[in-house]
Amino acid sequence: MIKMFKYKQVIVARADLKLSKGKLAAQVAHGAVTAAFEAYKKKREWFEAWFREGQKKVVVKVESEEELFKLKAEAEKLGLPNALIRDAGLTEIPPGTVTVLAVGPAPEEIVDKVTGNLKLL
């Protein structure tokens, strides 16, 4: 049986930074947790439905910081919970470098308006 999800979270990573796999995984996790907490505070019903369904997450990529900021503006305009992550700069990249944007959890059809055309990482 195929499970159908109504809610999801999409994490958008900057491919241009060429982060190590471990660093990228940590940044994606920071985004996922931070955006989920935003949803928990501001869109509790979306968070709870997403959590019950199994917490669907999709990781996609962009090639620039500018693209992340444009996507964040679109997410904000649609009222989607989101989180823009800036690295502390302790290891691979300078402090304050924007690494990922997490959008949702929220209804799939709304999230797709922001991230639906992006390629999987």
Swiss-Prot record:
Transmembrane segments: none annotated. Its main location: cytoplasm. It is found in: Cytoplasm. One of its GO terms (biological process) is translation. GO terms for cellular component: cytosol. InterPro entries: Pep_tRNA_hydro_II_dom_sf, Pept_tRNA_hydro_arch, PTH2. It catalyses: an N-acyl-L-alpha-aminoacyl-tRNA + H2O = an N-acyl-L-amino acid + a tRNA + H(+). GO terms for molecular function: peptidyl-tRNA hydrolase activity. It is an enzyme of class 3 (hydrolase). Keywords: Cytoplasm, Hydrolase. It holds the Pfam family PTH2. The natural substrate for this enzyme may be peptidyl-tRNAs which drop off the ribosome during protein synthesis. Belongs to the PTH2 family. This is Peptidyl-tRNA hydrolase. It comes from Pyrococcus horikoshii (strain ATCC 700860 / DSM 12428 / JCM 9974 / NBRC 100139 / OT-3). The lineage of its organism: Archaea, Methanobacteriati, Methanobacteriota, Thermococci, Thermococcales.
